[in-house]
């Protein structure tokens, strides 16, 4: 097996949360920008397909992101290091809740999640030498009842923007959560157990 030199990877994501999680386990990484400029369209269409299950959805998006990152790496003539990608979605009663499109959409999501259990699916993928390995983390999150005033105040904080399900477990939304069953880091956006497995399989040791 060809192993990467220097125990360094590329992260195909702009997410500060995923960067922080990689730093937490001591993984050196560089950011691989998937767009040359913000005005250009994204490489990955994140629209769910008809009848696509939540697991299949995050697997597909992650696989596409990871392989697109590897291709971009080769096109730019950058060092051929592993490319890590991930995708997170929130699922309520089988319905995929992506990132809110606007304030009204965020309010609708939070009202729906109030007092309910939902699932958070995060897939992580690592592409190296043209081979992509995938793992999936599934976590159940239980919200307490959230008042309309709290929803409005939370939206005003700006935290729901660009978050799957319109909330961030590592932020103020932690006050809404009664308990979780599964991976905290998976809900944040990068399940560290599954990520470390992929890294080990590719020849990168966390320890």
Curated annotation (Swiss-Prot):
* Site (described: Important for substrate specificity): 17, 88, 170
Look up keyword Protein biosynthesis and say if it applies.
no
Q: Where is the signal peptide?
A: none
Q: Which GO terms describe its molecular function?
A: dTTP diphosphatase activity; UTP diphosphatase activity
What cofactor requirement does the entry state? a divalent metal cation
Asked whether the UniProt record includes Nucleus among its keywords, one would answer no
Q: Which InterPro entries match?
A: ITPase-like_fam, Maf-like
Q: Which residues form the active site?
A: 87 (proton acceptor)
Q: Which HAMAP family match?
A: Maf (MF_00528)
Family label = Belongs to the Maf family. YhdE subfamily.
Q: What is this protein called?
A: dTTP/UTP pyrophosphatase
């Amino acid at each position: 097996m060809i192993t990467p030199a220097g125990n360094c990877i590329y992260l195909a994501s702009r997410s500060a949360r995923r960067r922080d999680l990689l730093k937490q386990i001591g993984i050196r990484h560089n950011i691989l920008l998937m767009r040359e400029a913000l005005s250009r369209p994204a490489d990955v269409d994140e629209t769910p397909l008809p009848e696509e299950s939540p697991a299949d959805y995050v697997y597909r998006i992650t696989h596409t992101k990871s392989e697109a990152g590897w291709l971009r790496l080769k096109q730019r003539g950058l060092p051929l290091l592993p490319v890590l990608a991930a995708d997170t979605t929130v699922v309520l009663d089988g319905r995929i809740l992506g990132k809110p499109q606007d304030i009204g959409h965020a309010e609708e999501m939070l009202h729906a999640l109030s007092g309910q259990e939902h699932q958070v699916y995060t897939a992580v993928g690592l592409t190296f030498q043209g081979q992509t390995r995938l793992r999936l983390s599934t976590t159940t999150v239980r919200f307490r009842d959230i008042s309309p005033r709290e929803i409005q105040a939370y939206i005003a904080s700006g935290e729901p923007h660009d978050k799957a399900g319109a909330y961030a477990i590592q932020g103020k939304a932690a006050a809404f959560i009664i308990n979780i069953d599964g991976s905290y880091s998976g809900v944040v956006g990068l399940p560290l157990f599954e990520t470390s497995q992929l890294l080990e399989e590719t020849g990168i040791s966390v320890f």
